[in-house]
């Protein structure tokens, strides 16, 4: 039974303990983000990240053509290569893939996205963000069957061969659904979904699938997308989703043991 593990790319995440924990295992897929590296490279190239908040409260990056180029350079370049190299140092044969490779992540370009600006709802223009429609597991199964560990990150591709930026948590959910994964771990730089973001001890421990909408108000900023990803994974047949920390030893084992916020 394939395990899908998404490793956060924001500041404060620790990659080493995750890879240490995964190295002895087999039959898993790693999905990565890389927001910290995207922001760093964007600043260096003179293309700082732009964000907007939708009327529903979800905060997203605006993927202008310049930003999309930065995403490709940062994620498919540095972040992914770093993960594959670190796996190699642990004796693991990993293969880096973007969602474009082999049509792995098929997406639809977002049209008519709206943003709240100074209390007004405005249309977002010049945005190359996408919504994932499905993941094709064929290439992943081929690699897994040959003993390789797939390491996957954005961007994705549309039916018209356009490259679009997609959310890595929701990409992980789509991959978990496509593979029929039993578990999806969304590992991040906090202990889980917090009732009070200022209180690290206020972790929501368990969420039933019919309770997700009710706890969404607690999910601020990027955490909201993780909760949405958890909901999408459950709806697609994944048995359990855990939002847990990368911090400390054995983060994968602890996540599988239920540390963090468990959705089922």
State where each predicted segment sits:
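C-terminal catalytic "cap/lid" subdomain
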Residues: 1-264
């Amino acid at each position: 039974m394939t395990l899908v593990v998404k490793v956060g790319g924001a500041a404060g995440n620790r990659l080493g303990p995750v890879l240490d924990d995964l190295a002895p295992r087999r039959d898993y897929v790693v999905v990565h983000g890389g927001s910290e590296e995207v922001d760093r490279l964007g600043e260096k190239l003179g293309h700082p990240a732009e964000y907007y908040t939708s009327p529903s409260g979800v905060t997203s990056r605006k993927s202008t053509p310049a930003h999309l180029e930065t995403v490709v350079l940062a994620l498919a370049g540095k972040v992914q290569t770093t993960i594959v190299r670190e796996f190699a140092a642990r004796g693991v044969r990993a293969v880096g893939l973007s969602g474009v490779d082999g049509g792995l992540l098929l997406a639809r370009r977002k049209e008519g996205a709206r943003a709240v600006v100074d209390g007004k709802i405005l249309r977002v223009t010049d945005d190359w963000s996408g919504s994932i429609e499905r993941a094709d597991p064929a290439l992943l199964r081929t690699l897994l069957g040959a003993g390789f560990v797939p390491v996957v990150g954005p961007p994705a591709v549309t039916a018209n061969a356009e490259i679009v930026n997609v959310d890595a948590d929701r990409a992980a959910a789509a991959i978990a659904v496509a593979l029929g994964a039993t578990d999806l771990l969304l590992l991040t730089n906090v202990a889980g979904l917090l009732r009070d973001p200022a209180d690290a001890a206020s972790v929501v421990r368990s969420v039933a699938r019919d309770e997700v909408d009710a706890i969404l108000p607690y999910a601020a900023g990027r955490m909201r997308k993780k909760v949405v990803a958890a909901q999408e994974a459950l709806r697609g047949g994944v048995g359990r989703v855990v939002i847990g920390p990368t911090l400390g030893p054995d983060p994968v084992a602890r996540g599988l043991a239920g540390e963090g916020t468990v959705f089922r």
